[in-house]
Amino acid sequence: MTLLYILGAIVMLIVILLFIALFLPNGYFIEKSAIIKKPCNFVMDRVADLHYYAQWNPWQQKEKNSESNITGLPKRPGHRYSWKGKKIGAGSLTLRDIDEKHVHFDLEFIKPWKARARDNWLFEEWGNDETKVTWQDFGALPYPMGRLMGYMVHKNLQRQFTEGLNNLKRFCEM
């Protein structure tokens, strides 16, 4: 009888979590900015040329021995950075579009779970030879687990974007 109560409580908890997930956001949006003491073109080149990516991105810094591969022409649509590691999983970042002030990437995660996101970068002249860099990312949070984990995803990405922009700032200003 006790086992039946425990099983009933577990089923009830699952039903409650599924119900809560119905009302949670089905996507996320992150935006962080930083001022870098270098001209706009210089900073934009360090983001749009993925040969520099491992030097400043916060995920690569966590697993420096991970495998990576860069294909395509720098600063051109189709330019791609792929990675594979035990800690950072596997995926790719592909330049989708670029203009004078923006760089847009498609982000695809393969491991530990499949997901897609969009990365957008805005570069604005700011003061004397300074650049305001804005990094945006948005993606879907699938029902139910993605939605239930949405708060943690958002919180972790906020921290990682701050770390990434600080790394980019140090890399550009050295």
Named regions from a protein language model:
Residues 37-41, 96-102, 122-132, 170-174:
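A short, structured loop/turn motif at beta-sheet edges
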Residues 3-4, 145:
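Structural motif marking the loop-to-transmembrane transition
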Residues 106-162, 168-170:
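Beta-strand/loop substructures that line and gate deep hydrophobic ligand-binding cavities in soluble
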Residues 35-40, 60-68, 100-117, 170:
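Charged, low-complexity, helix/coiled-coil-prone segments
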Residues 38, 45-48, 90, 156-159, ...:
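Generic recognition of short, well-ordered alpha-helical interface segments
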Residues 54-64, 90-92, 96-104, 138, ...:
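Eukaryotic helix-grip
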Residues 4-74:
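Hydrophobic ligand-binding cavity/cleft-lining segments
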Residues 79-126:
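Structured, soluble extracytoplasmic/luminal domains of envelope-associated proteins
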